[in-house]
Curated annotation (Swiss-Prot):
Gene: Coq2
Membrane-side (Mitochondrial intermembrane) residue stretches: 105-108, 175-176, 222-230, 299-300, 354-374
Transmembrane domains' residue ranges: 84-104, 109-129, 154-174, 177-197, 201-221, 231-251, 278-298, 301-321, 333-353
Entry-linked Pfam families: UbiA (PF01040)
Protein name: 4-hydroxybenzoate polyprenyltransferase, mitochondrial
NCBIfam families referenced in this protein's UniProt entry, alphabetically: ubiA_proteo
Function text: Mediates the second step in the final reaction sequence of coenzyme Q (CoQ) biosynthesis. Catalyzes the prenylation of para-hydroxybenzoate (PHB) with an all-trans polyprenyl group (such as all-trans-nonaprenyl diphosphate). The length of the polyprenyl side chain varies depending on the species, in humans, the side chain is comprised of 10 isoprenyls producing CoQ10 (also known as ubiquinone), whereas rodents predominantly generate CoQ9. However, this specificity is not complete, human tissues have low amounts of CoQ9 and rodent organs contain some CoQ10.
Cellular localisation: Mitochondrion inner membrane
Cofactor: Mg(2+)
Length: 374
C-alpha cells in the first residue's frame, strides 16, 4: 500500500479518493464532471489536461463541449447543447409540409431540409433575443444563471452582432421560398422579438410562445402550395398553440419559485394546483383541432391512429407529471418530441395511404372530347 500525499490511497490499481475530492453522488470529481452529474457551474470549468479517459459521445452537449473553446459560449447561446427547443419549433413545419404533399407522395424533402436549417437558426436567434432581454433576470434564477450573457461570457455588443449574423443567415433561407411565404416569414419576426417581454406583463407568456413557435404550421403549407388554405392551416396552427401551452406550462413549473420571487409571470404560477385540469382542456382542444385538420385535408386511417396516439401520450404526460419536481417536469417536457414525431409519421403514412390521382383518366377525357369535336 502506497500513500500519495493525502490525496488518495492506492491499493493495487484502485485509487480511493478522500471525501473532499468527491463530487455529487460520491463519484470522484473528475468522473462526476465527465458524466454530467456535477452542477451547472462545473460546465464552465476548464477541462482536464487529457480527454483520453472520456467515453465517446455524439450527444448535442458533447458536440458543443468538443467545439473550440471560443465558440462554445455562442453555441450554448443558440442552445445547440439542448436541441429539444429546435425540435419543437421544427415539428409543426413538418406537419404542414407533410399535409401539403400530393396524395400518395412523400413530403418535399428539400422543403423539410430548408425548414430544418431555418429552425436551427431562428431558434438560436430567439434564444439570443430572449437572453438579451432577460440577462438581469437570468442572474437571479438558479437554472439560468450560467447562460452565456448572464454569466458574462458574451457581452451585450457581441450578442447583438451574433444575433445579426443568425438573422442574416435565416433571411438567406427564407429567400428560397415564394413571395407569399417570404412575407409570412418576415411577419413572424415581430412575435420573435416581443415574446420574451410577455412574461413581464401577462400570466400567459406560454400563449405568446405558442403563437411564435407554431408559425411554421402556416408557413410550411404556403411554401409548398403558394398560399395558405385556412380550412387546414388554421386548425393546425391552433392545435400547435394548444400543444405549446401544455409543454411550456410543464416547463415553467421548473422555475416557478424563482419567477415568483423576481416578479416574472407564467401559466405555471397562474394555474398552480389546477395545472392538470387546464392541461387536460388544452389536450382535448389539440386532439379536436387535429381531427378537424384530418377531415379538411381528406386524411386516412394512419393519420387518425397517430392522432389517437398523440392524445394517449399527452394524457400520460399530464396524469403522471409531478409539477413540484423540476427533474420530472424536464423529462415530460422533452418527451414532447415524441408527440410531434408521432403526428408527422401519421401524416406521412396517411398521405401515402391516399390514392394517387389517376392521370390516365384525365388523358382519356381529353381524347374523348377531341373526338366529339372532330
Amino acid at each position: 500500500m502506497l500513500r500519495l500525499g493525502g490525496a488518495g490511497l492506492v491499493r493495487g490499481l484502485r485509487v480511493v479518493s478522500p471525501a473532499w475530492l468527491r463530487g455529487p453522488g460520491g463519484l470522484p470529481l473528475a468522473l462526476a464532471r465527465t458524466t454530467g452529474t456535477s452542477g451547472a457551474r462545473d460546465r464552465r470549468a476548464p477541462a482536464s489536461g487529457t480527454q483520453r479517459g472520456r467515453a465517446l459521445s455524439l450527444s448535442a452537449a458533447a458536440v458543443v463541449n468538443s467545439a473550440p473553446r471560443p465558440l462554445q459560449p455562442y453555441l450554448r447561446l443558440m442552445r445547440l447543447d439542448k436541441p429539444i427547443g429546435t425540435w419543437l419549433l421544427y415539428l409543426p413545419c413538418t406537419w404542414s409540409i407533410g399535409l401539403a404533399a400530393d396524395p400518395g407522395c412523400f413530403p418535399d424533402w428539400y422543403m423539410l431540409s430548408l425548414f430544418g436549417t431555418g429552425a436551427i437558426l431562428m431558434r438560436g436567434a430567439g434564444c439570443t433575443i430572449n437572453d438579451m432581454w432577460d440577462r438581469d433576470f437570468d442572474k437571479k434564477v438558479e437554472r439560468t444563471a450560467n447562460r452565456p450573457i448572464a454569466a458574462g461570457d458574451i457581452s451585450a455588443f457581441q450578442s447583438f452582432v451574433f444575433l445579426g449574423a443568425q438573422l442574416t443567415l435565416a433571411l438567406g433561407v427564407l429567400l428560397h421560398l415564394n413571395y407569399y411565404s417570404i412575407a409570412m416569414g418576415a411577419a413572424s419576426l415581430l412575435l420573435v422579438v416581443t415574446y420574451p417581454l410577455m412574461k413581464r406583463v401577462t400570466f400567459w407568456p406560454q400563449l405568446a410562445l405558442g403563437l411564435t413557435f407554431n408559425w411554421g404550421a402556416l408557413l410550411g403549407w404556403s411554401a409548398v402550395k403558394g398560399s395558405c388554405d385556412p380550412a387546414v392551416c388554421l386548425p393546425l396552427y391552433f392545435s400547435g398553440v394548444m400543444w405549446t401551452l401544455i409543454y411550456d406550462t410543464i416547463y415553467a413549473h421548473q422555475d416557478k419559485k424563482d419567477d415568483a420571487l423576481i416578479g416574472l409571470k407564467s401559466t405555471a404560477l397562474l394555474f398552480r394546483e389546477n395545472t392538470k385540469q387546464w392541461l387536460s382542456g388544452f389536450g382535448v382542444a389539440m386532439v379536436g383541432a387535429l381531427s378537424l385538420v384530418g377531415a379538411s385535408s381528406g386524411q386516412t386511417l394512419p393519420y387518425y391512429a397517430a392522432v389517437a396516439a398523440v392524445g394517449a401520450h399527452l394524457a400520460h404526460q399530464i396524469y403522471t407529471v409531478d409539477i413540484h419536481r423540476a427533474e420530472d417536469c424536464w423529462e415530460k417536457f422533452t418527451s414532447n418530441r415524441t408527440v410531434g414525431l408521432l403526428l408527422f409519421l401519421g401524416i406521412v403514412l396517411g398521405n401515402l395511404y391516399k390514392d394517387k390521382p389517376d392521370e390516365t383518366k384525365g388523358v382519356d377525357a381529353v381524347g374523348e372530347e377531341s373526338e366529339r369535336t372532330s
